[in-house]
Amino acid sequence: MNCVVIPAYRAAGSILSVIEAVGPEIELIVVVDDGCPEGTGVVVANRCSDPRVVTLMHDANQGVGGAFLTGMRYAIVRGADIIIKVDADGQMDPAQVPALIHPIASGQADYVKGDRFFFLTNSASMPPVRRFGNLALSFLAKLSSGYWTIMDPTNGFFAIHARVAELLDDERIAKRFFFETDLLFHLGLIRAKVVEFPMRASYGNEVSNLRVSHQLGPFLAGHMRNTTRRILYRYFFRDLSLASLQLVAGGVLFLFGLVFGLYHWWAAPPDQLVPTGTIMIAALTFLMGFQLVLSFLNYDISASPREPLHPFLKGWQAKAADEGRNAAASYVAPERVRREA
């Protein structure tokens, strides 16, 4: 079963048209009203007659990530196989869902996300501030997630296999604007295969709830934290390889050469030349360290997951899936559930 989850906040004017555009390949549509002051969930419950639609209500706003994770958990207990996130503002075309989920349905990927940078004309139509921010965040996301071929990390149009979703520690995933990027980091920890889907986004008159000045600090802090956690977990806790030694030795030599060279350059009298031996020590250690760090990065880039994970999870998760389906009828959550035809 395929399920679409639509986090909804201040989307009362667009949500019905988004639901109407969802094709017949989707058996379940979960709309999560994330404490919307416009009552988007009430609008859906009272005015939408689509029998596939279920509305979940958050009493308080939890962010786009919190809303999706609520819908994801509900979809899993309902027995969904593939879970798709579609935003409620109409920026994403639900008609593209069949192409989006094809790599997962055919066993080629665990997670598929949209890429708005694939088409140059579409990228040029992106607002300049948004384009620059996404390009900068793309590089940081490569470093923090380990998916070096992935662009557009903040794209919210994605699909994930339910078996892989069950492996995620959703309590530790960021709930607000860092959600999509943090999700990539957690997918990297379990070595899920991620591929991109070329898409065209529509930038209309919708008003973004993102305030760049407020989120810049949390985004940078989140990337630094995730980069540190990923490297420690991947190269020191889970495994110890030549790349681990390259990183340690390279980091030590690089920093030693840099600090040693700067110190002697600063401390040298202006009328005296720095001894050749001192220059050689600083230069050689700096260059050796730099080369070792480059070797580590080359290994890290080549180590991106290449095999999908979910085909290997079918056996040991079968029992859990049966229990989930049995629990669907008595699903209890801190959110109110409303369904009206």
Which stretches of residues belong to each language-model region?
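Acidic helix N-cap motif at the loop->helix transition within catalytic regions
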Residues: G13-S17, E38-R47
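Acceptor/aglycone-binding surface of glycosyltransferases and processive sugar-polymer synthases
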Residues: V54, H58-V77, I82, P94-F177, ...
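Short, well-formed alpha-helical segments that are part of the catalytic scaffolds
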Residues: I6-P24
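Short hydrophobic beta-strand elements that form part
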Residues: C3-P7, V30, M57
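Cell-envelope/extracellular polymer assembly enzymes that use nucleotide-activated donors
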Residues: N2-C3, D182
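Hydrophobic helical membrane-anchoring modules
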Residues: I173-A174, F178-A341
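A conserved acidic beta->alpha catalytic loop
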Residues: D33-V42, A60, G90
